[in-house]
Amino acid sequence: MSVSAFNRRWAAVILEALTRHGVRHICIAPGSRSTPLTLAAAENSAFIHHTHFDERGLGHLALGLAKVSKQPVAVIVTSGTAVANLYPALIEAGLTGEKLILLTADRPPELIDCGANQAIRQPGMFASHPTHSISLPRPTQDIPARWLVSTIDHALGTLHAGGVHINCPFAEPLYGEMDDTGLSWQQRLGDWWQDDKPWLREAPRLESEKQRDWFFWRQKRGVVVAGRMSAEEGKKVTLWAQTLGWPLIGDVLSQTGQPLPCADLWLGNAKAISELQQAQIVVQLGSSLTGKRLLQWQAICEPEEYWIVDDIEGRLDPAHHRGRRLIANIADWLEQHPAEKRQPWCVEIPRLAEQAMQAVIARRDAFGEAQLAHRISDYLPEQGQLFVGNSLVVRLIDALSQLPAGYPVYSNRGASGIDGLLSTAAGVQRASGKPTLAIVGDLSALYDLNALALLRQVSAPLVLIVVNNNGGQIFSLLPTPKNERERFYLMPQNVHFEHAAAMFELKYHRPQNWQELETALADAWRTPTTTVIEMVVNDTDGAQTLQQLLAQVSHL
């Protein structure tokens, strides 16, 4: 009997089971203990294979692939700390709903807690963050193949969001020629191998029912808050709110076109807050809200009812409103709850939104990061998509820009970390094949710098704008101690990215004005390669411009 041959047959059943649940993209890091999984994935023609040498980046690459494909994405890593590097991507997926399947190779039980090399306690190491965790036994023909495949099917068939951790111990030898070992064990699955359905099919999840009193609430004064959703959902939400005559406060990730732009500016105006207090119901569609003023208003608003509609399970309401938590696909929910044509009830807010946008436009000429955030809609590629980083850049775009309705926008706004942003952007581009504009700060770029290796492999133009304000300037917006701010919060690195781009053979530009930036962009969109554009700006201008605009709009 060949241990290595049966390891591969065991792994082949696991990988084939994944294909029955829509897995097409599989991300693989190098490793020896994961050899059975890697070879099984390589031999399965249903998969599109992605590789990367850094497991943390690999997890985020999978996250980006899952964001766009809306399908589960598998990740294969070897044992030891390689597994721990998947933690950030797993956490993000749990908060934003992407489906990740983490196949982690492991030492067999007799090599754990005895000083064996590269052997750590992997079962349960992700605590409560996976939706499901499976600790498989070491491969053995004493366990029927139908147990293995039905165990996988149960976890994936009930997976609606987040990650599944499947820990896979393998004993040595890991290498060797294939023979007939375990062939009859594998063949007991019969015609399943020729089928394309799961061995075990789970019943579909029950979603929230239609709200029978909707006909009553739609006649009231309402407010629509739009969080993270798909491009198609964004367009439908805009039309729905417009028909109801309710003001729509659209997040940067809502893709609604933000019909009342600069919400995070005008929500700092007392007149706007006073008018919003008249709302009898707030319907929030989608989660992961960005704007600070929006979150502050959400925390203090007291409508008669506060409804949150999202496909992700969980509370999703840090303000703990009295109301309803409705688990449903947003587009389906809108269809179940049609709008009734009514006249808009808000008067002050549309006026304030227009005046706020005019105040932003009046400052658009200076070459700075706040101005870039406002202008970003002018620089979007046709038939493309936008990936927005975290920290200051996403807040500036949310507050100062107005993105087109239905234009795809992606970001990691679950845990809102700056780790893995370039890797996630790479996954977003690969899954869609669309021209992609990605924008991050300098510390975010440094954090995930080796992901530039992933950006060498693109199927359409990708532009990475690195806004270099020399540190974490979001802390300039916070009451951090002045004497300790630079050393302990901002942490300026005084670096530029020309040599990093050159190391990975990527195009590089460092424009000094808007004309040079626009010329670089025009050139970049012509070829299916990655271009790094480093925009060096004054350290604190972006934060100061935002604060000045907030003060100005608050007094309108």
From Swiss-Prot:
Is Lipid biosynthesis set as a keyword in this record? no
- EC number(s) given by UniProt: 2.2.1.9
Q: Name one GO biological process term.
A: menaquinone biosynthetic process
The yes or no answer to whether the keyword Cytoplasm is present is no
Reading the lineage from the top rank, the first entry is Bacteria
Q: Which GO terms describe its molecular function?
A: 2-succinyl-5-enolpyruvyl-6-hydroxy-3-cyclohexene-1-carboxylic-acid synthase activity; magnesium ion binding; manganese ion binding; thiamine pyrophosphate binding
> What InterPro entries does the entry give?
MenaQ_synth_MenD (IPR004433), MenD_middle (IPR032264), THDP-binding (IPR029061), Thiamin_PyroP_enz_TPP-bd_dom (IPR012001), TPP_enzyme_TPP-bd (IPR011766)
* Associated pathway: Quinol/quinone metabolism; 1,4-dihydroxy-2-naphthoate biosynthesis; 1,4-dihydroxy-2-naphthoate from chorismate: step 2/7; Quinol/quinone metabolism; menaquinone biosynthesis
Q: Which SUPFAM superfamilies match?
A: Thiamin diphosphate-binding fold (THDP-binding) (SSF52518)
Q: How does it assemble?
A: Homodimer.
Q: What does this protein do?
A: Catalyzes the thiamine diphosphate-dependent decarboxylation of 2-oxoglutarate and the subsequent addition of the resulting succinic semialdehyde-thiamine pyrophosphate anion to isochorismate to yield 2-succinyl-5-enolpyruvyl-6-hydroxy-3-cyclohexene-1-carboxylate (SEPHCHC).
Q: What is this protein called?
A: 2-succinyl-5-enolpyruvyl-6-hydroxy-3-cyclohexene-1-carboxylate synthase
The protein's gene is named: menD
